[in-house]
Amino acid sequence: MKTKEKKDALSRLHIGGYGEAVMSRNFYSQSFNRYKKPENYANDHSHGRFDLPHVCLNFGYDFGQGWTMGSEIEFEHGGNGTAVEIEAEEAGEYEAEVEKGGEVNIEQFWINKEFWNGMFNIKAGEIIVPIGYSNVYHEPDQFFTVYRPEGEATIMPNTWHQVGISLWGRLKNWRYEAQLLSGLNSESFTAESFVHYGATSPYEFKVANNYAGALRIDNYSVMGLHIGLSGYYGYTFRNTLRTPGTKYDGLTGALGIIALDFSFNRWNWIIRGNVDYAHFSDADEISAYNQANWTHHRFQDGNPHHYSNIGSSAVAYAIEAGYNVFSQIPQMRQQNEQLFVFGRFEHYDTMASGTYESMYKYTKKYRCVFGLNYSPVKQITIKGEYSYRFFEKENNNGLTSDSPLYKQPYNNEPSVSLGITYCGKFL
């Protein structure tokens, strides 16, 4: 290959990525039973964590004539690892062990064809489902908190990606996108995470007995302001290898989601917000089905799905605002350094309505966050925050704590976190 051809090929290649390293200290119990009997865990010791929430590498290539390729490989929580060892204590038997928890995912892999200078595009492959703010803007420089915003990341898949077909484009100050996807799987829905795990598959393929559609429209007409409206609809029941009996013929598990989000970046302020609402039909019947069929055979274990109650609806809303105080210091402004002081409030509930709502009051969470984001250069941000997660107080109607009818309030959950992130293009 000639030198000129090599340079041309290299100019068509794009490499980038992002990553997060986090240290946190949680000043509340880490017991999985802390919501069942909160009085037993009120004085538990704090606990700390080190984590690599996301480390991603992006690769793209422009083939010419409007054809492009994009891919993203994501290592969640440092990836995973297994090893085979010979155990002396077990007569030299081979033993496979999980050396490290985590995940490795192909989060994106798509081919795109552009028409009419980007006014219309066709994209096919593993694509991001653009529902809500956090699925579209999931890089660490697009939110202030150390971890991704809790609300949307809890009630929906995040980052939500599936194999599908997308029609999208830009028209002046508008961007649109419509997608055809496989439906989610209601066997993976839970009380505490709603449909968060519904997009995953334990098999080597994604079952697509049901299909779903996603739509998003964005507007950029006002300088510094972006507004997005997105929606999703699809059936979720029977989207698995298992075939339910005829008594379930009328169930569809229809899932509808609507989300509104915005971001404002001007005058040294960044303000972001979102409102998300989801409704799930046949929640009671599918909850009963999941619990009655949590394993294929009474002597068989290892079912990858869940068998908890499911809410009929879920909700999440949030607002965050940050001001760049270095904008008022000439030397820092000239060096393009930034220091944002921010605050965030959010509420989310994975069991906002439904027959079992009273059993899962702890799913109704509120959270206040205050912190700093310091960027010495554009691609690197150091984050620090104090987070306070809390719950609605029980109405005990004047009962004292020694009464057998007294309902113990849930313990508040404060924490501090420190993180360092990078996000940018390398080539």
Where are these regions (language model features)?
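Loop-centered beta-sheet repeat module
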Residues: 188, 194-240
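Outer membrane beta-barrel
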Residues: 10-27, 45-186, 209, 213-214, ...
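Short Gly/aromatic-enriched secondary-structure transition segments
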Residues: 31-36, 166
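Outer-membrane beta-barrel pore domains
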Residues: 28-30, 42-44, 94-99, 109, ...
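Active-site rim elements
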Residues: 97-98, 152-154, 200-204, 305-307
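Surface-exposed loop/turn segments flanking beta-strands in extracellular/periplasmic regions
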Residues: 38-40, 144-151, 295-296
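Active-site glycine- and acidic-residue-rich loops that bind
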Residues: 158, 204-211, 250-254
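Sec-dependent signal peptide cleavage junction
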Residues: 1-12
